[in-house]
Design a protein with these regions (language model features):
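Mid-domain, small-residue-enriched loop/turn segments at the edges of structured enzyme/sensor domains
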Residues: 74-133
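Short, well-structured active-site flanking segments
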Residues: 20-39, 87, 138-142
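Conserved catalytic neighborhood of penicillin-recognizing serine enzymes
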Residues: 40-76, 83, 114-117, 121
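Active-site SXXK
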Residues: 5-33, 64
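Acidic helix-start/capping segments at beta-turn-to-alpha-helix junctions
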Residues: 29-46, 80-81, 148
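Extracytoplasmic
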Residues: 1, 5-9, 28-30, 90-95, ...
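Short, Gly/Ser/Thr-enriched beta-strand-loop segments that form substrate-interacting elements
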Residues: 156-179
Length: 179
């Protein structure tokens, strides 16, 4: 099976890891995180508006998934211990294929034949199934993750326009410098 760069699709996995920490009592969705202009990276449409007041962990997850905010993702990565800890979280849930190595925006480089920040379709599908329908997260956390994905504002409108009436979609797209 071929490896593919994750690009921003990793943000769902990241917020799943954050929610797992919330469920374990190691994090609080209402905790406010303050950051500075120096923390902002390319494409941060939500976090750039909250330099003075900061954002809660819940707001950062929402920004990361629904608007693909890169600074939000980096701040959340910091809360779990960085890229290596996200990979460790995935390994602990049985995904030994997916690897997350970089911070935003470097992870979007997608250099051919480079396994950094990649996964395989079957591994991603299995991991998403475990996060969204399995017992890894509490029911409340699973529903929160689904709610964020249903509210995706990046690719969601395009995908939703093709759905039959009454159908819904929960998604997280990703694109990089090489497509």
């Amino acid at each position: 099976e071929e490896r593919f760069p994750m690009m921003s699709t990793f943000k769902v996995l990241l917020c799943g890891a954050v929610l797992s920490r919330v469920d374990a009592g190691q994090e609080q969705l209402g905790r406010r995180i303050h950051y500075s202009q120096n923390d902002l990276v390319e494409y941060s449409p939500v976090t750039e508006k909250h330099l003075t007041d900061g954002m809660t962990v819940r707001e950062l997850c929402s920004a990361a998934i629904t608007k693909s905010d890169n600074t939000a993702a980096n701040l959340l990565l910091t809360t779990i211990g960085g890229p290596k800890e996200l990979t460790a979280f995935l390994h602990n849930m049985g995904d030994h294929v997916t690897r997350h190595d970089s911070w935003e925006p470097e992870l979007n480089e997608a250099i051919p034949n480079d396994e950094r920040d990649t996964t395989m379709p079957a591994a991603m599908a299995t991991t998403l199934r475990k996060l969204l329908t399995g017992e890894l997260l509490t029911l409340a956390s699973r529903q929160q993750l689904i709610d964020w994905m249903e509210a995706d504002k990046v690719a969601g409108p395009l995908l939703r326009s093709a759905l039959p009436a009454g159908w819904f979609i929960a998604d997280k797209s990703g694109a990089g410098k090489r497509g």
